[in-house]
Amino acid sequence: MTAVLPLPLPLADPAPRTPRLQREPLRLAKRLRHAVGQAIADFGMIAPGDKVMVCLSGGKDSYTLLDMLLQLQRSAPVPFTLVAVNLDQKQPDFPADVLPTYLRAQQVPFDIIEQDTYSVVSRVIPQGKTMCSLCSRLRRGALYAYAQAHGVTKIALGHHRDDIVATFFMNLFHHARLAAMAPKLRSDDGAHVVIRPLAYVREADIAAYAQARQFPIIPCNLCGSQENLQRQQVGRMLQQWDREQPGRVDQIARALGDVRPEQLADRTLFDFPGLGGGADAPLPDAAGWLAGSAAEHARD
């Protein structure tokens, strides 16, 4: 039976708190629950009878994700179960007791997968290079295998609004493509459905909530400490935009849900040759339109 995490309680404070300060954590929790519930409803993330696997890393995002889903589970319009799963990648100095202790105290069903991906990544990736990509692939493979073996129907990840927007700019700047993170998707092999219930949640709100709830945060010493990573650079850019023009990142996030293919230039999404009649006429060879082409030189 899946246990329910109690509502956040006011944190102990040696100094008297004003009514406004006492209410703020409750307002934040309510705002987060509303955003998560809205995302679940908008994208049909959870269906009746789903077994949702919450991928728990020990960071603020995955703690908040688990907390929100446990709270929403009590009032959700459909029944679903939750299991928290952590992949112990055998990183040096990883505090292996932190997550089990926390999850047992909260009476949350959980499993710990032990797989030494750290040694693989350290052996394959040259020193000083970014480990994130290979680490992510190995982690994803282990979690997918667990989901397949345990009848999991939805895999919940802790990516938030800022992650999604940052991924959009990563693809734009470094791969010349318009792509981000889908709030809900089917894995490449078609076997798993991945959901991101924090898709509408700001990272700043998650950080404030994690601090208020005093989650036992586990830092990532494998990839998070590497400097000058492209994602960190994009993150700083977005933070600066938000400081200089509040609301800009919100606008970008909303734009990702309002795509106009006919106003872009992707020929696989829009029939440009079919515009203006003559759609059935054969198109001339492209070389005929190229200035300085071999065909032009042949005529000369």
Swiss-Prot record:
What does the record's cofactor remark say about binding?
A: Binds 1 [4Fe-4S] cluster per subunit. The cluster is chelated by three Cys residues, the fourth Fe has a free coordination site that may bind a sulfur atom transferred from the persulfide of IscS.
Top EC class for this record: transferase
Q: In which pathway does it act?
A: tRNA modification
Enumerate the transmembrane spans. none
One term of GO molecular function: tRNA binding
Record has 4Fe-4S as a keyword: yes
Which GO BP terms, alphabetically?
A: tRNA thio-modification
Instruction: Quote the EC number.
Output: 2.8.1.-
Q: Which UniProt keywords apply?
A: 4Fe-4S, ATP-binding, Cytoplasm, Iron, Iron-sulfur, Magnesium, Metal-binding, Nucleotide-binding, RNA-binding, Transferase, tRNA processing, tRNA-binding
Which reaction equations make up its catalytic activity? cytidine(32) in tRNA + S-sulfanyl-L-cysteinyl-[cysteine desulfurase] + AH2 + ATP = 2-thiocytidine(32) in tRNA + L-cysteinyl-[cysteine desulfurase] + A + AMP + diphosphate + H(+)
Please tell me which stretches of this chain the record labels as motif PP-loop motif. Answer: 57-62
Q: Name one GO cellular component term.
A: cytoplasm
Could you tell me which Gene3D superfamilies the record lists for this protein?
A: HUPs (3.40.50.620)
Per UniProt, subcellular location reads as:
Cytoplasm
Please share what else the UniProt entry notes about this protein.
The thiolation reaction likely consists of two steps: a first activation step by ATP to form an adenylated intermediate of the target base of tRNA, and a second nucleophilic substitution step of the sulfur (S) atom supplied by the hydrosulfide attached to the Fe-S cluster.
What's this protein's family per the entry? Belongs to the TtcA family.
State how it assembles: Homodimer.
Role: Catalyzes the ATP-dependent 2-thiolation of cytidine in position 32 of tRNA, to form 2-thiocytidine (s(2)C32). The sulfur atoms are provided by the cysteine/cysteine desulfurase (IscS) system.
Q: What is this protein called?
A: tRNA-cytidine(32) 2-sulfurtransferase
> Gene of origin?
ttcA
